[in-house]
Amino acid sequence: MKSAVEKLNPTEAKITIDIAYTDLKPFVQETYKELANQIQIPGFRKGKVPSKLIDQRVGFDFVVENALNEGLNAFYQQALTENELTPLSQPQVEVLSKPEENDREADTKVEISVAIRPEIELPDYKGLEIQVEAREATAEDEQKALDELRARFGTLKTVDRPAAEGDHVTLDLQALVDGEEVDAANDLSYEVGSGTMLEGIDEAVTGLSAGEDATFETTLAGGEHSGAEATVKVKVTAVKERELPEADDEFAQLASEFDTIAELKEDLKKQAAESAVVEQGIEARDKVLDKLVELIEVPVPEKVIEDQLAQHFDSEQAQASAEPGHDTEEHRAEVRQNAENAFRNEIILDAVAEAEEVGVEQSELIDYIINMSQQYGMDPNQFAQMLDGSGQAGMMVGEVRRRKALAKVLETATVTDSNGETVDLSSFVGTGDDAETDEVETEASATE
């Protein structure tokens, strides 16, 4: 087998593969063997049908096509390896010549068009200068953390006053479209200001006391009438406020591992300081990546982006779960931009990982699986099985490797805050980015 590559542009190649009949012959013989077991001809035992009779029954072209179907991927993979190409899309194959009835041992020639990973040149990325917002944990941050902890152990108490933000109200709801009831529910519990129910409900119930009602207009967001304009009647049947426990030693023992409220407050102060560093680290990480993208030109393959757009908008699964107004010109432009950005990030960080000889340990994969499974609310073992079953194990390794590569760049960056002070992110980088829960999306799924 011989192969040659013509790069049509930095992200697209045409591969010509010449396959000698001697290389194709094993696949032809295997095809005859399989057909001999499938075809029944009187006078011949199963598996003993001569190839000439098989040709008469199905045609020699059929045999060759099946042989090519079986063997072409191996030839294609060999050509990719020989020419050091990484494919990013499904190959488009054209068979230019192959064995025919009148020339049964002719060579085969195929042309394969495919999107490929572009080659980039990395600049000197060490010592990048980044500025982040000045952040310092304050007494207000510490008090907020304490109040949030107290709220988790608070109890709801019925009050005789108008509802305000943060209160819990009990509601009766009725939704009407064109004057006809389409949905109704009673005794719903809702936290005013949480924004987790219908748009407009917070404004409607704020200021209402038990027994009072209001009407507002909204767009239904789910169910059979999703997207419909509706008139909603809401009645408040109870108003409750959260009564917080006293911040004393007894509460500290109930809500934490500490014996005194002083120890608990000191720990919350430490957590607030760590959170400030994490926030600065995340901002610095994002800005380092933005700086790399500014410095490096990455050609983006149109085929890869089009495939992702099709998957996002046109697949049966996407159409089944899409809300009304999902496929708009503005949304397509947004998805396209996100896909292009993700592709550039991936290519750059893969190149950095290669330059830094970044590897991935099994323990790092386990940490990644645990962190991601928590974000999805899944058992880590089930999450790992889901990734493996969907063929995304390679994506997982690549994502961890890219995170480590970005941490390498961040390690050498000079980071200052908006006050001109040097920011020490050694604790943030030293976590291996485990503290990050709002990860930068660097993977473009169609490239794996």
UniProtKB/Swiss-Prot annotation:
List the EC numbers from the record: 5.2.1.8
Where's the PPIase FKBP-type domain? 166-245
Does the keyword Chaperone feature in the UniProt annotation?
A: yes
Compartments where located:
Cytoplasm
Indicate whether Transferase appears among the record's keywords: no
Gene Ontology biological-process entries: 'de novo' cotranslational protein folding; cell division; chaperone-mediated protein folding; protein transport; protein unfolding
| GO cellular component assignments | cytoplasm
* Annotated segments matching region Disordered: 314-334, 424-448
Biased composition of type Acidic residues is found at 433-442
Where does the signal sequence lie?
none
Where does this chain mainly localize?
cytoplasm
- Its EC top class is isomerase
Basic and acidic residues: bias regions: 324-334
Record keywords: Cell cycle, Cell division, Chaperone, Cytoplasm, Isomerase, Rotamase
List the GO molecular function terms: peptidyl-prolyl cis-trans isomerase activity; protein folding chaperone; ribosome binding
What reactions does this protein catalyze? [protein]-peptidylproline (omega=180) = [protein]-peptidylproline (omega=0)
Task: Tell me the superkingdom of the source.
Answer: Bacteria
Pfam families from the entry? Answer: FKBP_C, Trigger_C, Trigger_N
Q: What does this protein do?
A: Involved in protein export. Acts as a chaperone by maintaining the newly synthesized protein in an open conformation. Functions as a peptidyl-prolyl cis-trans isomerase.
Query: Which family, according to the similarity comment?
Result: Belongs to the FKBP-type PPIase family. Tig subfamily.
Q: What is known of its domains?
A: Consists of 3 domains; the N-terminus binds the ribosome, the middle domain has PPIase activity, while the C-terminus has intrinsic chaperone activity on its own.
Protein name per Swiss-Prot or TrEMBL:
Trigger factor
